[in-house]
Amino acid sequence: MTEQKRPVLTLKRKTEGETPTRSRKTIINVTTPPKWKVKKQKLAEKAAREAELTAKKAQARQALSIYLNLPTLDEAVNTLKPWWPGLFDGDTPRLLACGIRDVLLEDVAQRNIPLSHKKLRRALKAITRSESYLCAMKAGACRYDTEGYVTEHISQEEEVYAAERLDKIRRQNRIKAELQAVLDEQ
């Protein structure tokens, strides 16, 4: 007879196409851990998350502290407008003449205006670094003095410089917003 054609039954048969599964020394968790242990693990995870968030907030606070805290454009306009209305077209600041800070400081001393040098400097920085002011700096635009008279015109180099400053300020504002979002998250 042809015994070679009959399948031979063996105990150590290999399965075709499947990877062998390890059945010895596998750990089977039959019971769940006690509630106090689960609670302790959750508290430890929560403490780790809070510590990480605190560290992230401290880092964001430190990174945010390098930027100047200038007043808003409206506050700066309201600071200077009562004393020098010629610098503004309604509530919009006009382009300021070069060297206007020294002129304003002399005017403060001469007229005894209750405005400190620091407040004046910060207000001028807030105005000249605002997006609306830098966008208005186009070649051929006029610069104004304290009385509202035209003193000079914007050159091509000043327009290029204003565009670069505008890009830099927008980048800084985007970074500030991201850092502030980190500080505000809970």
Swiss-Prot record:
Q: CDD domains per the record?
A: FinO_conjug_rep (cd00236)
Where are the annotated segments for Disordered? Answer: 1-22
Task: Name the cystine pairs.
Answer: none
Q: Which UniProt keywords apply?
A: Conjugation, Plasmid, Repressor, RNA-binding, Transcription, Transcription regulation
Which Pfam family is one of those matched by this entry? Answer: FinO_N
Any one Gene Ontology molecular-function term assigned to this protein's record: RNA binding
Q: Which InterPro entries match?
A: Fertility_inhibition_FinO_N, ProQ/FinO, ProQ/FinO_sf
Function description? One of the components on the FinOP fertility inhibition complex, which inhibits the expression of traJ gene, which in turn regulates the expression of some 20 transfer genes. The transfer genes are responsible for the process, called conjugal transfer, in which DNA is transmitted from one bacterial host to another. RNA-binding that interacts with the traJ mRNA and its antisense RNA, finP, stabilizing finP against endonucleolytic degradation and facilitating sense-antisense RNA recognition.
The similarity annotation says:
Belongs to the FinO family.
Query: Can you name this protein?
Result: Fertility inhibition protein
Organism of derivation: Escherichia coli
